[in-house]
Design a protein with these regions (language model features):
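Interfacial juxtamembrane loops and adjacent helix segments
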Residues: 55-137
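Membrane-lumen/periplasm interface segments of multi-pass, membrane-embedded glycan/lipid transferases
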Residues: 94, 273-370, 473
């Protein structure tokens, strides 16, 4: 299973090296430019949860840490100002101003994605790093986890290898990986899970490779614990060809097992809303940041107006112009591809002109003719329909979750949906688009070099225009 092919040696080593080179050159600059302030999406919440895990049962907060938790950002426009901010925050880290005691040291299932960041925060605290260094060091745990998991996703992929490497090197995925967030864990784990599933489904032998199957189920599950909306993806395992060669009893056991796993994880998302609806707790499930939001009242509204709700959901998904990226009207003026791949959150998004590089490169990689691609294109019609159904249901659940929790009750548009939520299903979507009619024939090595060049141009442009220009020079 883990043996390099001849084609891999000439192409994939180069691609993987490119991924590490991009991560090594750009991600630390993203970390450094963000010190010590919140710049990514809800970074104050993610830092708080990671810091609590790192602190054990007794959590001690300093003024600097509470500034981050409360997102008290001080804007810096020069190197000198940034240095002053670091010194200021380091001084505010000298005295403990608040303590809290957690009920247990056990980590909640939906907080497992914070472990890489928490481990590095714990190490940094043991080393007594100044706060600015500690804040950056915690992000390093997230980055290393991302590189490790994506390395194996690219390494093990039998199809669309270069596409995976290209996406892994783009500005937004690397920016997320060098921030406090669970998004990079969700993205990388689900992507690797899809890779292992695709190996067994399209390129497997007559028997399961049991470690791959178990690992895929594990990765899907862990990747979905922080965002349960992706859990339908675990049902892809029922498409494994070997499943249909089992006895009726074995099929039933596998079916029940997958079904139970699906419903247990979905229950973490659905049951609290249903139980609070039944009990009449109308305030449950609102956005903690404010606004007239309530998952319970929104669900009641949907039940009262089912057709309008379905029409709103379907319209929102297919219009592609309703991504509320930063909560500002001007954030919707960007091409959704730029919002997904060329976006540095509060730092801004690269202008639409850069999609002239992004779109053609993505098209080449998605429709690249490669060895074994015909196996995917000729997959039986039931399997394709089933996989597309899972893909669509997952997308709909993303929008439903945002409609319930982040959209004011009765609003005629869905707020809170961001294009980065689509990242975990990008690889699956690329596989499903494989067909026997649209093919791009180009040498793999040439395509790998081209993708590396384009990814680095976009990365350099993002770092220059969004982080450095007019600020730190």
């Amino acid at each position: 299973m883990f043996r390099w092919s001849a084609a891999d040696r000439s192409v994939i080593v180069f691609v993987l090296t490119s991924t590490f080179r991009a991560a090594a050159s750009s991600a630390p600059r993203n970390i450094a430019a963000a010190q010590p302030a919140c710049n990514s999406w809800d970074e104050q919440i993610h830092f708080r949860d990671a810091y609590k895990i790192a602190s054990g049962r007794n959590v001690a907060w300093t003024e600097a840490e509470l500034d981050i938790v409360n997102r008290v950002n001080i804007k810096c426009n020069t190197k000198e100002e940034n240095e002053l901010l670091r010194n200021y925050m380091d001084k505010r880290n000298a005295e403990i101003v608040m303590k809290e005691k957690k009920e247990t040291v056990l980590i909640s299932y939906d907080k497992l994605a914070y472990i890489p960041m928490a481990v590095f925060l714990f190490i940094g605290k043991c080393l007594k790093l100044p706060f600015s260094a500690l804040f950056a060091f915690g992000k390093l745990g997230n980055l290393l986890m991302y590189i490790f998991v994506m390395f194996w996703a690219i390494r093990l992929a039998k199809s669309r290898k270069i596409l995976l490497a290209f996406i892994a090197m783009l500005p937004t995925p690397l920016f997320l990986a060098s921030s406090y967030t669970y998004d990079s864990v969700v993205f990388s784990f689900i992507t690797l899970g899809c890779v292992l599933w695709a190996r067994e489904t399209f390129f497997g032998g007559n028997r399961y490779h049991t470690p791959s199957v178990l690992m895929a189920i594990f990765l899907f599950t862990v990747g979905c614990l922080s965002k349960a909306v992706y859990i339908p993806l675990v049902l892809l395992m029922l498409l494994l060809p070997q499943f249909y060669k089992k006895s009726k009893k074995e099929k039933l056991l596998v079916f029940i097992g997958m079904g139970m796993l699906f419903f247990v994880v979905m229950a973490t998302f659905v049951l609290p809303i249903i139980s609070n609806t039944v009990s009449g707790n109308l305030s449950y499930g609102g956005d903690s940041r404010g606004g007239d939001t309530s998952a319970v009242r929104q669900l009641i509204s949907m039940i009262k107006h089912p057709w309008s709700s379905v029409k709103l959901m379907v319209g929102g998904v297919f219009q592609l112009d309703n991504f509320r990226n930063l909560g500002r009207a001007e954030a919707d003026n960007y091409f959704f591809g730029n919002l997904m791949f060329l976006n540095f959150a509060s730092h801004g998004t690269l202008a639409d002109k850069w999609s002239i590089l992004l779109l053609p490169m993505m098209t080449l990689l998605v429709f690249q003719k490669e060895e074994g691609s015909e196996r995917i294109a000729k997959f039986h019609i039931f399997g394709k329909v089933y996989a597309w159904l899972i893909f669509i249901v997952t997308i709909m659940l993303i929008w439903l979750a945002m409609y319930l929790s982040f959209t004011p009750v009765g609003e005629q548009q869905i707020a809170g949906v961001q294009t980065r939520y689509y990242l975990p299903v990008i690889y699956l979507g690329a596989l499903l688009l494989s067909n026997s009619k649209i093919k791009v024939e180009i040498k793999e090595y040439s395509l790998a070099k081209l993708s590396f060049i384009v990814a680095n141009i976009l990365q350099i442009a993002a770092v220059w225009e969004l982080l450095l220009q007019g600020r730190l020079i």
